[in-house]
Amino acid sequence: MSQSTSTLRRNGFTFKQFFVAHDRCAMKVGTDGILLGAWAPVAGVTRILDIGTGSGLLALMLAQRTDESVTIDAVELDSEAATQAQENIAHSPWPQRITVHTEDVRQWVPRQTARFDLIISNPPYYEQGVECATPQREQARYTTTLDHEALLTTAAECITEEGFFCVVLPEQTGNTFTQQALSMGWHLRLRTDVAETESRLPHRVLLAFSPRTGECFSDRLVIRGPDQLYSEGYTALTQAFYLFM
């Protein structure tokens, strides 16, 4: 392996079918994004929108999970992250299926002529407080650039009637987000509470909303078993992606 390739591998995350470099992105590859990309329902989808794609992780995971006819639009406001996402996608098996748009999604969505049957986002969830090291990090971590109401409104403008809008959030933030979504006419259809171990309280929640009403299916996912190895449930969900699972 060349020195440049070795450096690249240290600045990113290697999955079974693709590599994600993230050294120019404010938010790195992490468990939240991997959970969301593996969990989001993809049956029957034809058009996917990834809001705030960052390194392109979610777009790449969804490309792996769907067939060749599915197209994915990935929108990212930060130009450095968008460029890195484009590079990651160009080196993946699916460069023709994913298009990166360097733009504010609120300006991009009104120009679209077709709706999406899956919209996905790993959104910011911190209120502005402690100052971040860079404006890019602040944009990725705080809700000041695209708050949750604006995110819900934007998704509602471009989703199909049967579509799903999926997010991952901290447990308490997710509960607040859900109440806000319900008040805006969304319906909660899927919810998975995520705990690190069986004995711990959930710390993350995976949520899928739809414009159409219907039964809400809820479950719980534990990441690690008593032996601190990945649980059967987490392994089943993510083993198509993790290199050594």
Swiss-Prot record:
What catalytic reaction does the record list? adenosine(37) in tRNA1(Val) + S-adenosyl-L-methionine = N(6)-methyladenosine(37) in tRNA1(Val) + S-adenosyl-L-homocysteine + H(+)
EC code = 2.1.1.223
An example of a GO molecular function for this protein is: nucleic acid binding
Q: Which InterPro entries match?
A: DNA_methylase_N6_adenine_CS (IPR002052), SAM-dependent_MTases_sf (IPR029063), Small_mtfrase_dom (IPR007848), tRNA_Adenine-N(6)_MTase (IPR050210), tRNA_adenine-N6_MeTrfase (IPR022882)
Give the chief site where it resides: cytoplasm
Q: Which GO terms describe its biological process?
A: methylation; tRNA processing
One Gene Ontology cellular component annotation? cytoplasm
The entry's function note states:
Specifically methylates the adenine in position 37 of tRNA(1)(Val) (anticodon cmo5UAC).
Tell me the protein's name: tRNA1(Val) (adenine(37)-N6)-methyltransferase
Species whose genome carries this gene: Citrobacter koseri (strain ATCC BAA-895 / CDC 4225-83 / SGSC4696)
